A protein has these predicted regions:
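Structural beta-sheet core signal
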Residues: 34-35, 81, 111-113
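Short beta-strand-centered segment that lines the nucleotide-binding/catalytic pocket of NTP-utilizing
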Residues: 29-44
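Inter-lobe coupling/hinge region of RecA-like P-loop helicase motors
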Residues: 148-174
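Conserved C-terminal guanine-recognition region of P-loop GTPase G domains, centered on the G4
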Residues: 91-118
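Beta-strand-loop-alpha "switch" segments that mediate conformational coupling across diverse proteins
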Residues: 117, 127-158
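Inter-motif core of Ras-like GTPase G domains
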Residues: 66-87
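Switch II (G3) loop of P-loop NTPases
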Residues: 36-40, 52-69
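Walker A (P-loop) phosphate-binding motif
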Residues: 1-31
Length: 189
């Protein structure tokens, strides 16, 4: 079983949204999953469940660097680190990078620039971060009301909106994670 850890020490960066979208992607293709919501704020649509036949485990973590997080990092095959693209997010992001380097140097790392837009601040952040990401891959999730609306209906943005930049970016992220776990891509319907 492959373990996917969605983590950042900063709250409000989209960890629960991304954990849900990953779980939805695996569910749409019939891939058995376990899901762990470790965040006491309860921001996920999915509830904690353990499937003995699971091929993957998706783990949503709280927004804090806790001692337990290092144990989760050590067990992770893929680490997804969401961040917003503001100057306030730089220091927590750098702390996460250092923690991953120290505790999970062999894990595949995927950075998600959440709330991406075409304005200068997002572009400046991306240009700066390209030099900081090391071997990690970078995916951009756009600012989109579709994420909010889909969540309100308890759905994936892929099922709710079907088309658009939010859907395309979510598919790209999910397929990159799937590939990193050795699971075939989800095809667009």
């Amino acid at each position: 079983m492959k373990t996917i850890l969605v983590c950042n020490s900063k709250g409000g960066v989209g960890k629960s949204l991304i954990a849900d979208e990953l779980a939805f992607s695996f569910e749409r293709t019939g891939t058995p999953i376990s899901f762990y919501d470790l965040d006491s704020q309860g921001g996920t649509i999915h509830k904690t469940k353990q499937d003995p036949k699971a091929q993957v485990a998706v783990v949503d973590t709280p927004g804090a660097l806790q001692s337990q997080l290092t144990d989760y990092m050590k067990a992770a095959d893929v680490i997804v680190i969401p961040t917003r693209t503001t100057s306030r997010d730089i220091e927590p992001l750098q702390r996460m990078q250092a923690a991953v380097k120290a505790n999970a140097p062999k894990a595949k790392v995927i950075y998600v620039l959440n709330g991406w837009n075409r304005w200068r601040a997002s572009n400046d952040f991306l240009e700066w971060f390209k030099g900081q990401a090391g071997n990690g891959e970078i995916v951009k999730l756009p600012q989109s009301e579709s994420f909010v609306q889909a969540s309100a209906y308890g759905q994936s943005v892929v099922e709710y909106a079907r088309f658009g930049k939010a859907v395309e970016a979510t598919r790209e992220l999910c397929n990159l994670v799937r590939k990193s776990c050795g699971i075939s891509e989800e095809k667009a319907r």
